[in-house]
Amino acid sequence: MREPRVALESAVLTHGLPYPLNLEVALALEEAVREEGATPKTIALVRGEVRVGLSPEEMEALAAGGAEKASLWNLAALLAQGRSAGTTVAATVHLAHLHGIPVFATGGIGGVHPEPYDESADLVALSRTPILVVSSGPKAILDLRATLERLETLGVSVVGYRTDRLPAFFSPDSPFPVPARVDTPMEAARVYLRARALGLGGVLLVNPVSQGLPYEQVALWVEEAGRMAAREGVFGKALTPYLLRKLSELSSGETDRVNRRLLLENARLAARVALALAGLE
């Protein structure tokens, strides 16, 4: 049986959470994967080199600040310039596949923003890369209906884990149904193998967070945060971190607590799927 490995992104370490919480969470994610019997591989750029698995010293340096954020459009340039960077979902998906890691755990994927139009590179990366991604759905700040439509158009296999509806990141439920459901890690592994045999792209396994927040309440906070961003002229790559920061303020830190929980739950599920997959291959 081949070694079950789980890729983990490093943007949560460099841009997702404040120091030292970011380092604490990144280390906890790796430990959660190990506890389930798989090997964690946090992916990042360190001084112009791709690292698949980080030392404690490298994690500390990335968490302390000053690192870039690497997506597909600037990945080559950052490497050529010798920079250090946290990897987004899109970059992590690409690099994990290059290094033969078929399972990746994250919090939430990027998608389609409502206004002005802005689409994450995560969607195209998922469509063209045969990898299984465990997440709690698209980030709560996105247009879920439009994101689900784009995933369908791009041919990404969206599968609910013990749910018939799309999780909305902080919320375990939303009004939008998913096209397929599985109830065990083994079922998820079999879907991935079928997708790979068919030459399809990625499988997005959406895992509802336990003890999440009500969908309607989060939607109100997102609307208010969006108005703040519009007033302050925030857009582009600055928009997502701005909105997530405002959601934390509006919820008195509750979204941060749920974010940590869902990251850990997704890491554990990804490890279980990786173990099932290793037993099938």
Curated annotation (Swiss-Prot):
Gene3D superfamilies: Indigoidine synthase domain (3.40.1790.10)
UniProt EC number: 4.2.1.70
Cofactor list: Mn(2+)
Reaction(s) catalysed by this chain's protein: D-ribose 5-phosphate + uracil = psi-UMP + H2O
Co-factor note (free text): Binds 1 Mn(2+) ion per subunit.
Pfam family for this entry, one: Indigoidine_A
Class of this enzyme: lyase
Gene Ontology terms: cellular component: cytoplasm
Quaternary assembly: Homotrimer.
Name by which UniProt lists this protein: Pseudouridine-5'-phosphate glycosidase
Record organism: Thermus thermophilus (strain ATCC BAA-163 / DSM 7039 / HB27)
